[in-house]
Amino acid sequence: MDKLFVAAIKEETVGLDYFKHIGVGKINAAYNTLKLIQIYKPKIIVNYGTAGAINTKLKGIVECTKFYQRDMDVRGLDFKLGETPFDKAKEIIISDSGYSCGTGDSFVNQKIEMEVDVVDMEAYAIAKVCMLENIEFKCFKYISDNADENANNDWNTNLALGAEAFAKMINKNFNFND
């Protein structure tokens, strides 16, 4: 298998049967992505999922190419917000042309300290596994909400719309015959 498509939950990929589901949160995403790599040995992993927009100008599907751990906070020991102590990877930047994604193990429904374009719960973990395993990584997020007090309701309302939009985008950009 050259391409492996992963998403956190089935509800994000209704009608997209080629997706493997890796669970919610960084630990589930990292562990299950690594298991899938061992089974399928892909050359590229494509992650799709929903995200909250910190940059409220964003709508629809965006490509994320910069990844940060928004809930890694060891500032009390003089590390920066998002920096994992003694880890060489301070952030993961695939390209400067896309948007930044702050990944953490919480659903964001209020302002956060980290300056990123979108927030999710899996992308950094998948990007890190891909980096460590030397696998190309692509990440697309559907803006389901604005990571504010309405985020919970907006996410539920927009979940199915994201799968439809992604299906259209993916069919134009990826060849399923190779």
State the predicted function of each range.
Residues 1-4:
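Extreme N-terminal starter segment of soluble prokaryotic enzymes
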Residues 6-10:
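Structural motif
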Residues 11-178:
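Glycine-rich phosphate- or other oxyanion-binding loops that anchor nucleotides, phosphorylated ligands
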